[in-house]
Amino acid sequence: MNTEKVAFDIISLAGDAKAELQKALKLAREGKFSETDALLEKASEQLQQAHKLQTQELLTREANGEKLQFNVLISHAQDYLMTTYTLEDVAVEIISLYRLIKK
């Protein structure tokens, strides 16, 4: 797979995960925790897929001696993936707080 396709796939998966996390936060605020949990799981799966792409298609190839062309698109994909991972961490904590408040 070429690096441009990998970058777009990572961005797409991370973007979908981010949208699911934002929905999960909204539903948690409303006390709809079963729906929230399903969205958190879906987001986690999307992030795992993006991470797998990053590892198999970029990092492993580079580690095996292939010289990948660096470009802004790859940088954006990496950044978007990592910021979405951060959002996931924060969302899980905020949702835990909503669970306590809604008891």
Give residue spans per PLM region.
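Terminal alpha-helical segments
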Residues: 1-103
